[in-house]
């Protein structure tokens, strides 16, 4: 029999409010509204479908403080992670958010109303206290703490929800089950004992082995329940991961395993998150849950030490297992024995027996360089999916981002580089010349710091999309401010290579080379806040290459860039 939901009743607000959704939708159109963030959208979906039972809304102050301080709601039920709706002072004033007010919550993708919140209270959370107690340290190296201090707004709104409609999904719809649907699916399959496996990473042979062992030891079936909401920054995208999971599923014994996707926004909260994950799986009807070593750990703190001990998560779920109400299965690390061609638990390896493993870092290196990935480590079908999403360097996109004063020679080098790269004929090459991007992307902008930063952000977005598509993007703005350059790098490098090239031609030479007389116009006061004259140029301290056109020719400069790309494998043989 499927497990009883946390709190005794599954809070499926879609079912509860099904008879009045038409009237709720009509009312929502008349109400002040809040457009949700991506994390709030994930939280709302699990509030509405019962995944966060017993919650029926975002935490009010009393529940919030209880969860932060004692891991309990005001009614005494165990709950470890605050589920809050953060808003700004401006949103409060604009929507007149106050107790008893009804607010429509809108999907950020299409602005459709998803729910109506009846406000109970508005309060200012103690973010440092939340960071210290929930996540173990007020350290912004932790992604959830960084979110608290740098992204989350200053106030929380607590209140109860009514469901208008569910968020739309257009990907992997057949694998998205609400708790109600998954419980019905288990009933149809006549599954009475189900082990759930949580993951935010691709799965390989070792994962298949450890999950099969867990299911066999418990005489249970298996639910692969990966997170497809928000995970740790830098994780592999969920589209790739789901293709991996689908490639892996036929490797399980027939009828043993099912795949269901969980739209959860992870906090990487370690021990507390492990308890939270177990409660969520309990609500989805499973009877057992695998908790791993350093479960949901974010890695190192700002001092280079792990935020959590390797077994803290397992210890906390063990402490509260009677309240969690499902059996916790400790994650068994397995390792490959080439002598016997099998995976065996790491703690059962006889002394002197050779074992093999490939780390995540080594796997990424092999994917980037095109080196073989042995079949003992992963299935060919899985490797094929990963190679499609992670081609070798000479098939990846990259951006060459020039920075330097006006008339420093950036455009001449950029155009020559475009011609040189076109000789390769292995990828599309796009040049975002400064005069073109000003005219086509930022014609309404001036030369203030704010306008320059916006201009750079727009160019970085375009370059990032080109890089994502496997093209070579050449960008040649002045880009005088380090903060904007660093933001551009962050935008682009998640999709491929990024090289900052400083064209360090002296100001005096730039003035001599200025055929358009821009510097003279700036000196006469016709152009305000002009870089190099009455606005600063922050010299890069992190450039990948520095070029002075007075000391080398355009051809020499291009050759240096080509050598840099060749060294890193972006051009030439894989």
From Swiss-Prot:
ATP binds at residues 198-201, 292-295, 334. Its EC number is 2.7.7.4. Allosterically inhibited by 3'-phosphoadenosine 5'-phosphosulfate (PAPS). The record marks 331 as: Induces change in substrate recognition on ATP binding. InterPro entries: APS_kinase, ATP-Sase_PUA-like_dom, P-loop_NTPase, PUA-like_sf, Rossmann-like_a/b/a_fold, Sulf_adenylyltr_euk, Sulf_AdTrans/APS_kinase, Sulfurylase_cat_dom. SUPFAM superfamilies: Nucleotidylyl transferase (SSF52374), P-loop containing nucleoside triphosphate hydrolases (SSF52540), PUA domain-like (SSF88697). The keyword Amino-acid biosynthesis applies. Pathway: Sulfur metabolism; hydrogen sulfide biosynthesis; sulfite from sulfate: step 1/3. Keywords: Allosteric enzyme, Amino-acid biosynthesis, ATP-binding, Cysteine biosynthesis, Cytoplasm, Methionine biosynthesis, Nucleotide-binding, Nucleotidyltransferase, Transferase. Residues 171-395 are annotated as: Catalytic. Pfam families: APS_kinase, ATP-sulfurylase, PUA_2. One of its GO terms (biological process) is hydrogen sulfide biosynthetic process. 3'-phosphoadenylyl sulfate binds at residues 435-438, 452, 478-479. Gene3D superfamilies: HUPs, P-loop containing nucleotide triphosphate hydrolases, Sulfate adenylyltransferase. It catalyses: sulfate + ATP + H(+) = adenosine 5'-phosphosulfate + diphosphate. The record marks 204, 207 as: Transition state stabilizer. Residues 1-170 are annotated as: N-terminal. Residues 396-574 are annotated as: Allosteric regulation domain. The active site is at residues 199-201. Homohexamer. Dimer of trimers. PANTHER family: SULFATE ADENYLYLTRANSFERASE. Catalyzes the first intracellular reaction of sulfate assimilation, forming adenosine-5'-phosphosulfate (APS) from inorganic sulfate and ATP. Plays an important role in sulfate activation as a component of the biosynthesis pathway of sulfur-containing amino acids. In the N-terminal section; belongs to the sulfate adenylyltransferase family. The adenylyl-sulfate kinase (APS kinase) is non-functional. It is involved in allosteric regulation by PAPS. PAPS binding induces a large rotational rearrangement of domains lowering the substrate affinity of the enzyme. This is Sulfate adenylyltransferase. It comes from Mucor circinelloides f. lusitanicus.
